[in-house]
Amino acid sequence: MRPILKYRGGKSREIPEFIRYIPNEYNRYIEPFLGGAAVYFYLEPEQAIINDINTKLIEFYQDVRNNFPRLQAELGTLQQEYERNQRQYVFNRNAEQDQTIRVENLNEGLYYQMRDMYNGIVASPYLNGTLYYFINKTAYSGMIRYNRNGEFNVPFGRYVNFNTGILTQEHNQLLQGAQILNTDYANIFNMAVDDDFMFLDPPYDCAFNDYGNLNMQNGFNEDEHRRLAQDFRNLNCRALMIIGRTPLTEELYGDYIRCEYRKNYSVNIRNRFNAEAMHIVVTNY
Protein backbone atom coordinates (compact mmCIF):
# COMPACT_ATOMS: atom_id res chain seq x y z
CA MET A 1 0.00 0.00 0.00
CA ARG A 2 1.31 3.45 -0.89
CA PRO A 3 1.79 6.18 1.73
CA ILE A 4 -0.66 9.07 1.57
CA LEU A 5 1.45 12.15 2.21
CA LYS A 6 4.47 13.93 0.84
CA TYR A 7 6.99 13.84 3.67
CA ARG A 8 10.59 14.99 3.84
CA GLY A 9 12.72 12.04 4.88
CA GLY A 10 10.09 9.51 3.77
CA LYS A 11 11.36 5.96 3.29
CA SER A 12 9.32 4.70 0.30
CA ARG A 13 12.30 4.48 -2.05
CA GLU A 14 14.65 3.12 0.60
CA ILE A 15 12.60 0.10 1.69
CA PRO A 16 14.47 -2.29 -0.68
CA GLU A 17 17.69 -1.36 1.13
CA PHE A 18 16.55 -2.68 4.52
CA ILE A 19 13.48 -4.88 4.02
CA ARG A 20 15.59 -8.05 4.39
CA TYR A 21 16.37 -7.10 8.00
CA ILE A 22 12.71 -6.85 9.06
CA PRO A 23 11.53 -10.01 10.89
CA ASN A 24 9.04 -12.22 9.06
CA GLU A 25 6.97 -12.79 12.19
CA TYR A 26 5.98 -10.50 15.05
CA ASN A 27 2.80 -9.79 16.97
CA ARG A 28 2.49 -6.02 16.84
CA TYR A 29 4.16 -3.31 14.77
CA ILE A 30 5.32 -0.14 16.56
CA GLU A 31 6.55 3.09 14.97
CA PRO A 32 7.34 5.97 17.37
CA PHE A 33 8.44 8.48 14.67
CA LEU A 34 5.70 7.93 12.10
CA GLY A 35 6.12 10.83 9.68
CA GLY A 36 4.93 9.79 6.23
CA ALA A 37 4.33 6.19 7.40
CA ALA A 38 5.82 4.59 4.28
CA VAL A 39 7.03 1.46 6.10
CA TYR A 40 3.77 1.07 8.04
CA PHE A 41 1.69 1.19 4.87
CA TYR A 42 4.14 -1.09 3.05
CA LEU A 43 4.01 -3.80 5.72
CA GLU A 44 0.25 -3.43 6.41
CA PRO A 45 0.38 -4.87 9.95
CA GLU A 46 -2.92 -6.00 11.48
CA GLN A 47 -1.98 -4.59 14.90
CA ALA A 48 0.08 -1.45 15.38
CA ILE A 49 1.01 1.44 17.62
CA ILE A 50 1.89 4.47 15.52
CA ASN A 51 3.01 7.78 16.98
CA ASP A 52 4.43 11.15 16.13
CA ILE A 53 5.08 14.29 18.15
CA ASN A 54 3.60 16.38 15.30
CA THR A 55 0.03 16.99 16.48
CA LYS A 56 -1.39 18.12 13.13
CA LEU A 57 0.07 15.08 11.39
CA ILE A 58 -1.48 12.73 13.93
CA GLU A 59 -4.84 14.51 13.66
CA PHE A 60 -4.73 13.76 9.94
CA TYR A 61 -4.22 10.02 10.48
CA GLN A 62 -6.93 10.02 13.15
CA ASP A 63 -9.35 11.59 10.69
CA VAL A 64 -8.45 9.00 8.05
CA ARG A 65 -9.35 6.32 10.59
CA ASN A 66 -12.32 7.90 12.37
CA ASN A 67 -13.90 10.33 9.89
CA PHE A 68 -13.12 8.86 6.49
CA PRO A 69 -16.46 9.53 4.70
CA ARG A 70 -16.48 13.21 5.68
CA LEU A 71 -12.75 13.58 4.94
CA GLN A 72 -13.18 12.05 1.50
CA ALA A 73 -16.23 14.21 0.75
CA GLU A 74 -14.52 17.44 1.79
CA LEU A 75 -11.41 16.65 -0.23
CA GLY A 76 -13.52 15.68 -3.24
CA THR A 77 -15.29 19.06 -3.17
CA LEU A 78 -11.96 20.87 -2.88
CA GLN A 79 -10.51 18.87 -5.77
CA GLN A 80 -13.44 19.86 -8.00
CA GLU A 81 -12.88 23.53 -7.15
CA TYR A 82 -9.13 23.20 -7.67
CA GLU A 83 -9.55 21.57 -11.09
CA ARG A 84 -12.14 24.16 -12.15
CA ASN A 85 -9.80 26.98 -11.15
CA GLN A 86 -6.90 25.35 -12.98
CA ARG A 87 -8.90 25.02 -16.20
CA GLN A 88 -9.88 28.69 -15.98
CA TYR A 89 -6.28 29.69 -15.34
CA VAL A 90 -5.01 27.76 -18.37
CA PHE A 91 -7.75 29.26 -20.56
CA ASN A 92 -6.97 32.81 -19.44
CA ARG A 93 -3.23 32.31 -19.81
CA ASN A 94 -3.59 31.00 -23.35
CA ALA A 95 -5.93 33.85 -24.25
CA GLU A 96 -3.54 36.51 -22.97
CA GLN A 97 -1.31 37.60 -25.84
CA ASP A 98 0.99 39.71 -23.70
CA GLN A 99 3.09 37.08 -21.93
CA THR A 100 4.51 39.68 -19.53
CA ILE A 101 1.12 40.12 -17.85
CA ARG A 102 0.60 37.93 -14.81
CA VAL A 103 -2.57 35.86 -15.11
CA GLU A 104 -4.45 35.32 -11.86
CA ASN A 105 -4.68 31.75 -10.61
CA LEU A 106 -7.68 31.36 -8.30
CA ASN A 107 -6.00 28.34 -6.72
CA GLU A 108 -3.43 30.67 -5.22
CA GLY A 109 -6.19 32.50 -3.35
CA LEU A 110 -7.75 29.18 -2.36
CA TYR A 111 -4.42 28.00 -0.98
CA TYR A 112 -3.88 31.05 1.19
CA GLN A 113 -7.45 30.88 2.45
CA MET A 114 -6.89 27.24 3.45
CA ARG A 115 -3.54 28.16 4.99
CA ASP A 116 -5.24 30.78 7.17
CA MET A 117 -7.70 28.11 8.32
CA TYR A 118 -4.82 25.73 9.01
CA ASN A 119 -3.17 28.41 11.13
CA GLY A 120 -6.38 29.18 13.01
CA ILE A 121 -6.45 32.77 11.72
CA VAL A 122 -9.97 32.31 10.32
CA ALA A 123 -12.67 29.80 11.20
CA SER A 124 -12.71 26.53 9.26
CA PRO A 125 -15.66 24.36 8.23
CA TYR A 126 -13.27 21.50 7.47
CA LEU A 127 -11.80 18.63 9.44
CA ASN A 128 -8.23 19.19 10.61
CA GLY A 129 -7.29 16.23 8.42
CA THR A 130 -8.75 17.93 5.36
CA LEU A 131 -6.71 21.06 5.97
CA TYR A 132 -3.54 19.04 6.53
CA TYR A 133 -3.96 17.00 3.35
CA PHE A 134 -4.71 20.06 1.22
CA ILE A 135 -1.69 21.94 2.56
CA ASN A 136 0.54 18.88 2.20
CA LYS A 137 -0.36 18.44 -1.46
CA THR A 138 -0.38 22.08 -2.57
CA ALA A 139 2.37 23.81 -0.53
CA TYR A 140 5.65 24.42 -2.30
CA SER A 141 7.71 21.21 -2.48
CA GLY A 142 5.58 19.59 0.24
CA MET A 143 7.53 21.59 2.82
CA ILE A 144 6.50 21.99 6.46
CA ARG A 145 7.80 25.24 7.94
CA TYR A 146 6.64 27.61 10.66
CA ASN A 147 7.49 31.21 11.52
CA ARG A 148 8.33 32.51 14.98
CA ASN A 149 4.64 32.93 15.75
CA GLY A 150 4.05 29.24 15.11
CA GLU A 151 2.24 29.90 11.83
CA PHE A 152 2.75 27.68 8.80
CA ASN A 153 4.27 29.98 6.17
CA VAL A 154 5.16 27.91 3.08
CA PRO A 155 3.97 29.57 -0.18
CA PHE A 156 1.67 28.07 -2.80
CA GLY A 157 3.32 25.38 -4.91
CA ARG A 158 1.42 26.10 -8.17
CA TYR A 159 0.78 22.43 -8.87
CA VAL A 160 -1.44 21.56 -11.81
CA ASN A 161 -3.21 18.74 -9.97
CA PHE A 162 -4.57 18.23 -6.47
CA ASN A 163 -4.95 14.46 -6.36
CA THR A 164 -7.21 13.03 -3.67
CA GLY A 165 -7.21 9.55 -5.24
CA ILE A 166 -4.10 8.62 -3.25
CA LEU A 167 -6.25 8.43 -0.10
CA THR A 168 -8.23 5.18 -0.20
CA GLN A 169 -10.64 3.05 1.79
CA GLU A 170 -7.78 0.57 2.23
CA HIS A 171 -5.85 3.17 4.24
CA ASN A 172 -8.90 3.68 6.43
CA GLN A 173 -9.32 -0.06 6.98
CA LEU A 174 -5.67 -0.62 7.87
CA LEU A 175 -5.72 2.20 10.42
CA GLN A 176 -8.63 0.55 12.24
CA GLY A 177 -6.07 -1.84 13.72
CA ALA A 178 -3.77 0.92 14.96
CA GLN A 179 -3.45 2.90 18.15
CA ILE A 180 -2.63 6.40 16.91
CA LEU A 181 -0.77 8.43 19.53
CA ASN A 182 0.77 11.88 19.88
CA THR A 183 3.44 11.75 22.58
CA ASP A 184 7.17 11.56 23.26
CA TYR A 185 8.80 8.47 21.78
CA ALA A 186 9.88 7.27 25.25
CA ASN A 187 6.26 6.65 26.20
CA ILE A 188 5.92 4.40 23.15
CA PHE A 189 9.11 2.52 24.07
CA ASN A 190 7.54 1.73 27.44
CA MET A 191 4.57 0.07 25.71
CA ALA A 192 6.72 -2.46 23.83
CA VAL A 193 6.80 -6.15 24.78
CA ASP A 194 9.06 -8.95 23.60
CA ASP A 195 6.99 -10.17 20.63
CA ASP A 196 6.59 -6.68 19.11
CA PHE A 197 8.66 -5.26 16.25
CA MET A 198 9.61 -1.59 16.27
CA PHE A 199 10.69 0.46 13.26
CA LEU A 200 12.54 3.68 14.04
CA ASP A 201 13.12 6.58 11.66
CA PRO A 202 14.14 9.36 14.08
CA PRO A 203 15.31 12.87 13.18
CA TYR A 204 18.82 12.69 11.82
CA ASP A 205 22.02 14.09 13.30
CA CYS A 206 22.25 17.12 11.02
CA ALA A 207 21.67 20.87 11.13
CA PHE A 208 18.19 20.66 9.60
CA ASN A 209 16.58 17.94 11.68
CA ASP A 210 13.27 19.29 13.00
CA TYR A 211 11.48 18.11 9.81
CA GLY A 212 9.47 21.33 9.91
CA ASN A 213 7.92 20.15 13.16
CA LEU A 214 6.43 22.91 15.31
CA ASN A 215 7.06 20.75 18.39
CA MET A 216 10.79 20.50 17.61
CA GLN A 217 11.82 24.03 16.63
CA ASN A 218 15.12 23.61 18.48
CA GLY A 219 15.87 20.43 16.60
CA PHE A 220 16.75 16.93 17.80
CA ASN A 221 20.10 17.75 19.37
CA GLU A 222 23.01 15.63 20.58
CA ASP A 223 21.49 15.15 24.02
CA GLU A 224 18.31 13.83 22.41
CA HIS A 225 20.32 11.45 20.24
CA ARG A 226 22.20 10.12 23.27
CA ARG A 227 18.92 9.63 25.14
CA LEU A 228 17.47 7.78 22.15
CA ALA A 229 20.52 5.51 21.84
CA GLN A 230 20.35 4.57 25.52
CA ASP A 231 16.62 3.89 25.27
CA PHE A 232 17.22 1.83 22.14
CA ARG A 233 19.67 -0.40 24.02
CA ASN A 234 17.08 -0.97 26.76
CA LEU A 235 14.17 -1.89 24.49
CA ASN A 236 12.12 -4.97 25.31
CA CYS A 237 11.44 -5.85 21.66
CA ARG A 238 13.25 -6.26 18.36
CA ALA A 239 13.90 -2.92 16.73
CA LEU A 240 15.32 -1.65 13.44
CA MET A 241 16.45 1.93 12.99
CA ILE A 242 17.38 3.91 9.89
CA ILE A 243 19.51 6.97 10.56
CA GLY A 244 22.10 9.10 8.79
CA ARG A 245 25.73 8.09 9.24
CA THR A 246 27.70 10.70 11.19
CA PRO A 247 30.54 10.46 13.72
CA LEU A 248 27.94 10.75 16.48
CA THR A 249 25.66 7.97 15.22
CA GLU A 250 28.65 5.71 14.56
CA GLU A 251 29.76 6.29 18.16
CA LEU A 252 26.29 5.69 19.58
CA TYR A 253 25.36 2.54 17.67
CA GLY A 254 28.71 0.88 16.91
CA ASP A 255 28.21 -2.89 16.95
CA TYR A 256 24.47 -2.51 16.31
CA ILE A 257 25.11 -1.24 12.76
CA ARG A 258 24.24 -3.92 10.20
CA CYS A 259 24.90 -2.16 6.90
CA GLU A 260 24.87 1.21 5.16
CA TYR A 261 23.54 2.54 1.88
CA ARG A 262 23.72 5.72 -0.14
CA LYS A 263 20.77 8.10 -0.19
CA ASN A 264 20.32 10.85 -2.78
CA TYR A 265 18.06 13.73 -1.74
CA SER A 266 15.99 15.29 -4.50
CA VAL A 267 15.57 18.62 -2.68
CA ASN A 268 18.30 20.50 -0.82
CA ILE A 269 16.26 23.01 1.16
CA ARG A 270 18.21 26.11 2.25
CA ASN A 271 21.47 24.22 1.61
CA ARG A 272 21.12 22.75 5.10
CA PHE A 273 21.97 19.15 4.29
CA ASN A 274 23.92 17.30 1.61
CA ALA A 275 22.18 16.14 -1.55
CA GLU A 276 23.94 12.82 -1.02
CA ALA A 277 24.36 11.02 2.29
CA MET A 278 24.93 7.60 3.81
CA HIS A 279 22.25 5.94 5.88
CA ILE A 280 22.94 3.14 8.33
CA VAL A 281 20.71 0.22 9.31
CA VAL A 282 20.79 -0.40 13.06
CA THR A 283 19.23 -3.43 14.77
CA ASN A 284 19.23 -4.90 18.28
CA TYR A 285 18.90 -8.49 17.04
Question: What are these model-derived regions, one by one?
Answer:
Residues M1-N24:
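Class I SAM-dependent methyltransferase Rossmann-like catalytic core
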Residues F18, Y29-L43, Q47-T55, Y133, ...:
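Conserved proline-anchored active-site loop of SAM-dependent methyltransferases
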Residues F33-A38, L167, I243-P247:
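Short, polar loop motifs at secondary-structure junctions
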Residues V39-E44, N172, N190-V193, L248-D255:
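Short loop/helix-cap segments at secondary-structure boundaries that form the rim of catalytic
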Residues E46-Q176:
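Class I S-adenosyl-L-methionine-dependent methyltransferase module
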Residues Y146-Y159, Y204-E224:
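Mobile active-site "lid"/loop adjacent to the S-adenosyl-L-methionine
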Residues I166-F199:
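A mid-sequence, solvent-exposed acidic-amphipathic segment
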Residues D205, N213, N218-Y285:
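Long, positively charged, glycine-interspersed low-complexity recognition regions
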